[in-house]
Amino acid sequence: ADRVTVSAPLHRASMTYDDRHHEHFEEHGYVRLGQLLSASELSALRERIDALMLGRIATEGITFQLDGEGDEYADLPPRALGSPKETLAYRRVDELHQDGLFLAYMQHPVCRQITRRYIGEDVSVFRSMFMNKPANSGTVLPWHQDVGVGWGLDRNPTTTVWTALDDATTATGCMQIVPGSHRLGVLNEGHYTLEEDQAFHCADDKVMDFEVEAGEAILIHNWLLHRSGVNGTDRPRRAFSVAYMPAATTNVSTGERFPVIFGKGALP
C-alpha cells in the first residue's frame, strides 16, 4: 500500500540543537529535547498507531509483535507482517517510515539538526519502531546496548531519538539507564549485556529512572546501558523510537541498504 498521505506538516518546534545539548549528550549519553509534539500532533500519532493496530488502515510492509505468555524477553513471539490480530495490546510495531504521519515526525527539523551534526547529509534508519507496555502487562527488557553488529549491520550507529506518546513513569515501566555508560564502548556485540558486566556497571546506585512526559523527545546514544520493566498501571506506556545512521550502512548478510530519511534519495 502507498504511504498514508499527510494533509498538513507536523508542528515545527523552534528548539535548536546547540553545543549545550551536544556537551550533555557527550557526557551523559542522553539529552532531553523537550516537547517536539504539540497536543494535537501527539493525539494524531496516538490515533494513527491505534488505527494501524486495529487494522483500520493499510499495514502492508509494517510488522507487529505481541507480548509473550510471560513477562520475560525470551518468551516473545516473532514479529509478523500485517496485523494478524486486531488489538491495542501489541508490544511493538516496526517499519513506521512507511506511514506518512510517522515519517513526517521522523523528518522533524530538530532531528535533521541532530543527524547533520552526528551523521552527515545522507541519513537512513535501521528501525522506526512503536513500543508499547499495555496496561497491567508488558515485557521485561533486560540490560542492553543497541549494538549495530548485533543487529547485523556493518557499523554501530549511535543516534536514536525516543519520543514518549504517554507519560513514562516508574509505575508504568519507564526506561532505566546508567548515565555515562556509553563511554564504556560496546560491551557485547551480541547486544545484551553479560551478567558480569551488569553486576559491575548496573549497580543500583548507578541506575537512573528515566521518567518522561508525553510528547517529550530524548536523544539517546545507542551504547547507553538501558532496560525497562513491566507496566503495573491501568494505562498504557507507549513510545516511538527511531535509530538514525549513515545512509551507506548495509546489512552484512544481504548487502542491502536501509530507508533514507534525509539527503539524496530521501523518502518524500
Positions of PLM-derived features:
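Glycine-rich nucleotide phosphate-binding loop and flanking beta-alpha elements
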Residues: 39, 149, 226
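Non-heme Fe(II)-dependent double-stranded beta-helix
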Residues: 4-27, 34-143, 259-265
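Non-heme Fe(II)/2-oxoglutarate
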Residues: 55, 59-63, 188-192, 217-219, ...
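Active-site rim elements
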Residues: 99-104, 203-208, 228-229
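A structural signal for short, well-ordered beta-strand segments
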Residues: 127-130, 161-163, 240-244
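Catalytic core of non-heme Fe(II) oxygenases with the double-stranded beta-helix
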Residues: 113-114, 137-209, 249-257
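Short acidic-glycine-tyrosine-enriched beta hairpin
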Residues: 207-219
